[in-house]
């Protein structure tokens, strides 16, 4: 196997050694964990709540279906899945601070019995093959170092007939709105982050990471190469975000 330790990868618009990205991403989310939900409201003007509602509905929650929620963060997807009638959830995140927030929310909503929590790297899941019905990742894939590996791991742990879902910021498809979107992302958002969270740099990184993430067709191709079948995607809000899905058949 080739030594990739000296390779560089993107971290926003910067490049860093491959081995450093995980640490730097962890620092970002340590910083924003307590205000993560506010951050999502700022980045999407609150529309992320509608996107997540559609995302979970597409997963078709059923009591007999199990969910692995990758980069589960503050628990939004896991809790929505349970509220919609889904079965047991394992919520994972590489960042322990984020999981603590998610656990607290689950306790507040009296749904702690339905969720397991694990600090785990989506690139090397500590799970056996073919063990879950659904795998989800929402606003997390762009922060992973090796996205191809995450997709391969998601497929590995899915049962035959299982389905993978990804909700992520993507490429705006409305050209006339692009100048305003750029100004919002790179001028307004970091300024708001500095004022609300006293953390301009983290919000700057998050805006940059969106632009560096593969576009809709590129991500669909990556999923097919990982072995997913019947891959499709749905644009949300003109392509500001997109839901991708693929089956393990």
Swiss-Prot record:
One Pfam family, short name: Ubie_methyltran
Record-linked InterPro entries: SAM-dependent_MTases_sf (IPR029063), UbiE/COQ5_MeTrFase (IPR004033), UbiE/COQ5_MeTrFase_CS (IPR023576)
EC number(s) reported in the record: 2.1.1.163, 2.1.1.201
Enzyme class label: transferase
Record keyword Methyltransferase present: yes
Molecular function in Gene Ontology: 2-methoxy-6-polyprenyl-1,4-benzoquinol methyltransferase activity; demethylmenaquinone methyltransferase activity
Positions contributing to S-adenosyl-L-methionine binding: 74, 93, 121-122
Keyword Isomerase carried by entry: no
A single BP term in Gene Ontology: methylation
Keywords in alphabetical order: Menaquinone biosynthesis, Methyltransferase, S-adenosyl-L-methionine, Transferase, Ubiquinone biosynthesis
PANTHER family xref list: 2-METHOXY-6-POLYPRENYL-1,4-BENZOQUINOL METHYLASE, MITOCHONDRIAL, METHYLTRANSFERASE
Role noted for this protein: Methyltransferase required for the conversion of demethylmenaquinol (DMKH2) to menaquinol (MKH2) and the conversion of 2-polyprenyl-6-methoxy-1,4-benzoquinol (DDMQH2) to 2-polyprenyl-3-methyl-6-methoxy-1,4-benzoquinol (DMQH2).
Protein name as it appears in the record: Ubiquinone/menaquinone biosynthesis C-methyltransferase UbiE
Organism: Acidiphilium cryptum (strain JF-5)
